[in-house]
């Protein structure tokens, strides 16, 4: 009939349009990598090599819609230029057509959606002519700025961000990335065919399938349950330990560090390997094999900036986020030096600017021989020593031995000022920083010269590129206060290096010069309500007297108070204010929201605040805090209200009287809040809740509160 005939004509017209060859084809194709089953099946059947995304299908399809010497223009995400998923597309294009021109836009220039974009023109011909490329990555400010830079390049082809190159050069680089800005020196380095995989093997790491179940910060679990210094699977099994050190990536840091995690690998990872828990989104795999517990090199796979490589001693497993390379001792230092140089990051930017550093990419880096290898090794070993020494200065690491400001108090017979101790530490930190910066700049110079990249790179580094800390008075005094809390809980001891107690059996002989609190509680108050060692400032005075001597006590209190920067009439008031209002915020930062001290908090009025130490907690802790401390503080509040009422009745000065009334009313509010909190605490205390440290902080923090809110949230 007529309707059917019309439909057939429309289909024929569409088919003719789709099969016709054109002089020019231009499109902004759809970006879609998650296709429905019908589309996915079709794409896999007809465009298998280009099926990573629908836009890559259109790239190939559209150039085949053009006549010989015709042009196809596109605007697409620029990932096709670099990542492995599109390697077959790149190979096909480089073999069959010409990239006539390409503009790589700044990452967020396309304001309608933050998608890294390039726009390019392909010519349906095979020839050896050079293409023209504009790299606008450095020019932020949206499409207006991008357009201006394009116009500038048209007017002046000599601008530094315009490149002309033959696309054959891309085939010299492993993976054939469209690295149009690669200088000839780098191409020659690749051409020598001396990739890193000739001396090292790299592997992606373990996927646990459920990090909340199988991975912990080391400080969450009982320290004696961690298997340290393990060298192979057999030692791990016979140790009967549950937790083992685990590399899991982390922030930018070179040479050594980011050793913060442990993984449940008890009995060769039996629980993980046999995980049938329905809540697991992804089953575990990549179990490390013979790479487990071996020394080597790791890095953070996905970075927001430069790559940084770290030495890993034996005893670690490694995560998917932290790939691992195994190498002999003989070449370790040379390879570490090269990987942490500016040259490596420059070449990685050619291979994959998406900042996703996969093992295959690292293995392909060209490693040239150097005449001055002994000098390189010397700088590398010095850098590793500096970085590892700095890493253990912080209590968030299990290698922590002693707080650095206290390192030299024995030389002064514990009769010294905190200011002098800090200044000595400050100089040591500066010397360490300067040494590492010098080492890295010397290595940069050596490798820049070796690879002939003097026109592209300079050896100098900015301070932010040096991954050890300088001293910082505010931060370091806050850390000193944290150490004091740890000593008062018995986690640390002034007489025993490293951890004194983190689960297991309590050993009173470890504490001689300063005794930790007998109970698992430190009450935080805005004033001294106890008049004895239950008051935090009494304990802090004792701590300072033991460490720095009584002669300098007031001077030291003043220095510390100034560094903490809190308001108050006296130095003691200022320090008390920090502990009462800000200590716990800093603690959450240090322990990355997995606190080892938990803060009981009655609410806005601060009626009751106290810390308890996770590793000393038991089912009777809440009852002890309530009866021995909360009720005592309640009586103190009641007494203060009575006293203030007496003062108010006899005070004739209006201004003074109003101040007393304000104090009384505030104390009344604290008392009312405390009484309400007492009822909640009693409810939980009567339950005698036990915890299992293996469950981790998130689970246990919620568990000990039952169905009420007793603790400051982990945020």
Residue map of PLM features:
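Class I S-adenosyl-L-methionine-dependent methyltransferase module
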Residues: 1-20, 24
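Terminal accessory regions of large proteins
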Residues: 404, 410-413, 420, 427-438, ...
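Proline-centric
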Residues: 32, 62-67, 322-332, 345-392, ...
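Signature of N6-adenine DNA methyltransferases within the class I
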Residues: 16-234, 258, 268, 274-279, ...
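Generic recognition of flexible, low-complexity loop/linker segments
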Residues: 10-16, 61-62, 105-109, 230-235, ...
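Short Ser/Thr-interspersed hydrophobic loop/turn segments at strand-loop and sheet-helix junctions
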Residues: 290-308, 318, 335-349, 584, ...
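Contiguous C-terminal substrate-recognition/catalytic subdomains in enzyme active sites
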Residues: 233-290, 298
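Short coil/turn segments at secondary-structure boundaries
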Residues: 3-4, 200-213, 229-230, 258-262, ...
């Amino acid at each position: 009939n007529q309707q059917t005939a019309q439909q057939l004509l429309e289909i024929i017209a569409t088919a003719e349009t789709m099969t016709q060859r054109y002089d020019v084809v231009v499109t902004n194709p759809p970006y879609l990598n998650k296709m429905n089953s019908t589309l996915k099946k079709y794409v896999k059947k007809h465009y298998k090599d280009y099926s990573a995304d629908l836009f890559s299908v259109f790239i190939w399809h559209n150039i085949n819609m053009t006549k010989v010497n015709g042009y196809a223009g596109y605007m697409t995400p620029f990932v096709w230029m670099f990542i492995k998923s599109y390697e077959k597309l790149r190979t096909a294009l480089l073999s069959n057509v010409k990239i006539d021109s390409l503009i790589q836009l700044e990452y967020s220039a396309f304001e309608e959606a933050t998608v890294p974009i390039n726009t390019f023109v392909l010519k349906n011909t095979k020839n050896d002519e050079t293409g023209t490329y504009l790299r606008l990555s450095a020019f932020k400010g949206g499409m207006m700025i991008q357009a201006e830079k394009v116009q500038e390049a048209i007017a002046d082809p000599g601008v530094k961000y315009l490149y002309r190159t033959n696309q054959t050069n891309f085939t010299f680089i492993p993976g054939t990335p469209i690295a149009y800005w690669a200088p000839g020196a780098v191409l020659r380095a690749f051409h020598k065919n001396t990739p890193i995989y000739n001396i090292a093997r790299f592997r992606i790491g373990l996927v646990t399938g459920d990090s909340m179940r199988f991975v912990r910060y080391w400080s969450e679990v009982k320290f004696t349950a961690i298997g340290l210094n393990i060298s192979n699977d057999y030692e791990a099994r016979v140790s009967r330990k549950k937790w083992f050190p685990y590399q899991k990536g982390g922030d930018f840091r070179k040479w050594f560090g980011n050793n913060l995690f442990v993984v449940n690998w008890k009995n060769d990872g039996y629980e993980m390997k046999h995980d049938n828990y329905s809540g697991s989104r992804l089953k575990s795999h990549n179990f490390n094999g013979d790479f487990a517990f071996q020394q080597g090199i790791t890095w953070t796979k996905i970075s927001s900036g430069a790559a940084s490589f770290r030495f890993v001693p034996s005893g670690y497993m490694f995560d998917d986020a932290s790939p691992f390379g195994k190498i002999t001792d003989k070449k370790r230092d040379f390879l570490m030096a090269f990987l942490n140089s500016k040259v490596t990051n420059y070449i990685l930017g050619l291979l994959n600017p998406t900042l996703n550093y996969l093992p295959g990419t690292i293995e392909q880096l060209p490693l040239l021989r150097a005449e001055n290898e002994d000098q390189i090794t010397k700088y590398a070993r010095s850098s590793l020593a500096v970085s590892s020494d700095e890493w253990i200065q912080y209590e968030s690491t299990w290698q922590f031995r002693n707080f650095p400001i206290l390192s030299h108090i024995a030389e002064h017979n514990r009769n010294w000022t905190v200011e002098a101790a800090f200044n000595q530490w400050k100089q040591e930190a500066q010397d360490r920083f300067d040494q590492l910066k010098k080492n890295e700049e010397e290595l940069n110079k050596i490798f820049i010269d070796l690879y002939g990249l003097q026109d592209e790179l300079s050896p100098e580094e900015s301070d932010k590129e040096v991954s050890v800390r300088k001293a910082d008075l505010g931060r370091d005094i806050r850390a000193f206060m944290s150490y004091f809390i740890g000593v008062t809980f018995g986690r640390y001891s002034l007489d025993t290096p490293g951890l004194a107690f983190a689960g297991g059996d309590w050993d009173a002989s470890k504490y001689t010069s300063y005794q930790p609190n007998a109970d698992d509680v430190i009450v935080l108050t805005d004033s001294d309500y106890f008049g004895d060692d239950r008051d935090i400032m009494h304990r802090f005075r004792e701590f300072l007297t033991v460490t720095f001597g009584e002669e300098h006590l007031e001077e030291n209190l003043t220095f510390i108070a100034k560094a903490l920067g809190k308001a108050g009439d006296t130095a003691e008031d200022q320090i008390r204010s920090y502990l009462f209002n800000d200590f716990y915020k800093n603690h959450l930062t240090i322990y990355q929201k997995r606190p080892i001290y938990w803060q009981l908090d009655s609410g806005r009025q601060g009626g009751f605040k106290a810390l308890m130490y996770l590793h000393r907690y038991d089912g009777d802790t809440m009852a002890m805090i309530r009866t021995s401390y909360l009720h005592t503080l309640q009586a103190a509040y009641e007494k203060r209200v009575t006293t203030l009422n007496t003062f108010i009745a006899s005070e004739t000065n209006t201004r003074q009287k109003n101040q007393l009334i304000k104090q009384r009313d505030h104390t009344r509010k604290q008392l009312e809040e405390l009484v309400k909190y007492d009822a909640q605490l009693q409810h939980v205390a009567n339950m005698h809740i036990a915890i299992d440290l293996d469950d981790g902080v998130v689970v246990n923090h919620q568990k000990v509160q039952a169905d009420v809110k007793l603790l400051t949230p982990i945020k």
